[in-house]
Amino acid sequence: MTIGIIGAMEEEVELLKNSMPSVEEIVIGGAKFYVGEVAGKEVVLLESGIGKVNAALGTTLMADRFKPEVIINTGSAGGMAEGLAVGDVIISDRLAYGDVDVTEFGYTYGQVPRMPAFYQGDAVLLKKAETIYREYFAASENKAVYGLVVTNDSFIMRPDQHETIRTFFPDVKAVEMEAAAIAQVAYQFDIPFLIIRAISDLANQEATISFDEFIHLAAKQSATCIIELLKTI
């Protein structure tokens, strides 16, 4: 089984890359692929670049060239739900775009025409993750939560951005900039996927400071959770 793992930034894939005993690096159209083993599993690790287009391009190349049987997205996110703290992990059961609006033609806000309004994470992988992380976080000050992640081509920190997202997605747990695009490509290629992100900031006016300070912690939390999951796949 080949497992595809995608992170947007070098910081988000570094720990996983460094855990590979040997690595083959392949660059296609600016997307950096690292082929090797993680936790004894054959892995294609992608550093896609930031944003929806980079994520979709890289995921499409991965699906076409490397034929992964599962795709997992790692990285950081901004927490939107009450009670979330930096270092907590969000496992997404649903994903949506927060900056797509063709409601004039009868579509749901966030829905790309002829695509689902929400992309569903793989139920089997979600169940595995839930079982593993309940035990993993039992002795930790952090926690794993499950729910809706909303993707925007913007770094979310302003009150007006919050208001728009909460108006259309009142149950949103976290926001970030790639996951729904990855999910859409996985959906179109019929590849099971799972989104695992760690909270680097609380998507507020202190978000830029928090992100810069805690991106490495968030990347470590997310990558460590993925390694634990790989042991069970």
Curated annotation (Swiss-Prot):
Belongs to the PNP/UDP phosphorylase family. MtnN subfamily. Signal peptide: none annotated. It catalyses: S-adenosyl-L-homocysteine + H2O = S-(5-deoxy-D-ribos-5-yl)-L-homocysteine + adenine; S-methyl-5'-thioadenosine + H2O = 5-(methylsulfanyl)-D-ribose + adenine; 5'-deoxyadenosine + H2O = 5-deoxy-D-ribose + adenine. The active site is at E12 (proton acceptor), D201 (proton donor). The gene is mtnN. PANTHER family: 5'-METHYLTHIOADENOSINE/S-ADENOSYLHOMOCYSTEINE NUCLEOSIDASE, 5'-METHYLTHIOADENOSINE_S-ADENOSYLHOMOCYSTEINE NUCLEOSIDASE. Keywords: Amino-acid biosynthesis, Hydrolase, Methionine biosynthesis. One of its GO terms (biological process) is L-methionine salvage from methylthioadenosine. InterPro entries: MTA_SAH_Nsdase, Nucleoside_phosphorylase_d, Nucleoside_phosphorylase_sf. Catalyzes the irreversible cleavage of the glycosidic bond in both 5'-methylthioadenosine (MTA) and S-adenosylhomocysteine (SAH/AdoHcy) to adenine and the corresponding thioribose, 5'-methylthioribose and S-ribosylhomocysteine, respectively. Also cleaves 5'-deoxyadenosine, a toxic by-product of radical S-adenosylmethionine (SAM) enzymes, into 5-deoxyribose and adenine. This is 5'-methylthioadenosine/S-adenosylhomocysteine nucleosidase. Its EC number is 3.2.2.9. The keyword DNA repair does not apply. Substrate binds at G78, I156, M177, E178. One of its GO terms (molecular function) is methylthioadenosine nucleosidase activity. GO terms for cellular component: cytosol. Pathway: Amino-acid biosynthesis; L-methionine biosynthesis via salvage pathway; S-methyl-5-thio-alpha-D-ribose 1-phosphate from S-methyl-5'-thioadenosine (hydrolase route): step 1/2. It comes from the Bacteria. The keyword Repressor does not apply.
